[in-house]
């Protein structure tokens, strides 16, 4: 049952208060220690923020995707690692669920929604992109797959309990033969290496993974052989790209807030910056940029809810547009602050670093353009 408007507004107000209050305390701790405190995971789980988009009969809040995005905009105004936790936990259950058996749903989906297990989306490889050129492979022997290969840049790959991992049957090419597997981190033949710290999104762990004939039960495969990329692309990446687009909107909104606040109080030559047309016009451009990206993102979400086949392409359009918008907005926001904005612990300095990561998350701008171009040129034929 959809949440009514009054209850939704109450929830949104609660989340905004959390983001601007305790969320900022967590942000300061993360920036100081370069680690996400375990208490943040517990707090987000106990508040129900890690299961907002999951159905009520799964233990979630049952919020429809387009409304959930309005909440994601709020979370994105906080520290990027806080936003990342909410984003990943509200997305991975859906990728697992679409082709899960009842047994798999009980073993993986419901515990993940409840916050009892953590699952990392495990697609990217050192020598492959983010699609059908997977090189990690499995050999089937009876009721067991033996997994060999490498993965890297895996968000929460160090601390997860399971990897939702994509590989291919030995000897296959393209999307044929791809499989989606739930791999237990305690399986034999696994080496986990934490990657060096990133420029932004401090505190979020990323892993390099090596699998050397790691046994995975066939019962841990989602769907059939050949459906691996269906799980990855349709079940996760389309919605995740839309969610990342809205994350860009939220982060840009916070950057704009900081720029406006600074412009109203900072004086030069007897005038506040806001009284100078060059500054006022930059802020006006930001406002229009943010709203345009917000509306395209919501449009993509609603088309996905309507089962429109164009939703995949629209998700790439939304992500491309929102990322480019965020780049412009954060650059202007930092410029409004002047040199002082370049120093820690000014919040705009952190936002500027965090914003750059969005150009990579869930596919680079070049990948999004490739997806869009294939669609429009294919349609033209």
Would you name each region that the model predicts?
Residues 1-87, 98, 106-111, 328, ...:
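Amphipathic, small/basic residue-rich leader segments at the start of a protein or domain
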Residues 3-6, 11, 77, 192-291, ...:
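Glycine-rich beta->alpha junctions and the first turn(s) of the following alpha-helix
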Residues 24-32, 260, 264-271, 287-321, ...:
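C-terminal helix-coil-helix/basic helical segment that borders enzyme active sites and/or dimer interfaces
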Residues 112, 249, 253-256, 283-297, ...:
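Alpha-helical transition-metal enzyme core signature, strongest for iron centers
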Residues 144, 148-192:
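A short core secondary-structure module
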């Amino acid at each position: 049952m959809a949440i009514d408007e009054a209850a939704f507004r109450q929830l949104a107000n609660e989340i905004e208060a959390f983001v601007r209050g305790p969320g900022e305390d967590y942000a300061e701790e993360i920036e100081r220690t370069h680690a996400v405190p375990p208490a943040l995971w517990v707090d987000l789980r106990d508040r129900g923020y890690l299961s907002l988009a999951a159905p009520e009969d799964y233990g979630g809040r049952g919020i429809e995707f387009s409304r959930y995005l309005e909440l994601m905009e709020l979370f994105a105004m906080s520290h990027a690692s806080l936003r990342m936790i909410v984003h990943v936990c509200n997305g991975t259950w859906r990728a697992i669920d679409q082709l899960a058996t009842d047994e798999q749903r009980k073993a993986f989906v419901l515990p993940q929604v409840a916050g009892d297990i953590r699952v990392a989306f495990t697609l990217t490889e050192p020598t492959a992109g983010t699609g059908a050129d997977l090189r990690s492979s499995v050999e089937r022997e009876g009721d067991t797959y033996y997994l060999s290969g490498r993965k890297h840049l895996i968000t929460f790959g160090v601390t997860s309990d399971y990897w939702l991992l994509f590989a291919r049957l030995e000897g296959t090419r393209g999307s044929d033969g791809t499989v989606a597997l739930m791999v237990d981190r305690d399986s034999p033949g696994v080496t986990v290496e934490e990657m060096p710290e990133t420029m932004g999104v401090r505190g979020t762990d990323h892993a390099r993974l090596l699998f050397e004939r790691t046994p995975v039960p066939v019962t841990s495969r989602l769907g059939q052989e050949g459906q691996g990329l269906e799980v990855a692309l349709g079940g996760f990446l389309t919605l995740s790209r839309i969610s990342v687009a809205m994350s860009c909107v939220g982060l840009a909104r916070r950057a704009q807030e900081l720029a406006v606040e600074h412009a109203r109080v900072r004086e030069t030559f007897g005038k506040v910056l806001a009284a100078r047309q060059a500054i006022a016009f930059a802020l006006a451009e930001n406002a229009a940029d943010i709203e345009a990206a917000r509306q395209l993102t919501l449009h993509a979400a609603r088309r996905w809810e309507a089962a429109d086949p164009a939703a995949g392409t629209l998700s790439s359009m939304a992500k491309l547009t929102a990322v480019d918008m965020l780049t412009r907005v954060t650059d202007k926001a930092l410029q409004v602050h002047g040199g002082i904005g370049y120093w820690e612990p000014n919040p705009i300095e952190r936002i500027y670093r965090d914003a750059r990561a969005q150009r990579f998350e869930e596919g680079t701008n070049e990948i999004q353009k490739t997806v869009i171009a294939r669609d429009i040129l294919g349609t033209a034929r």
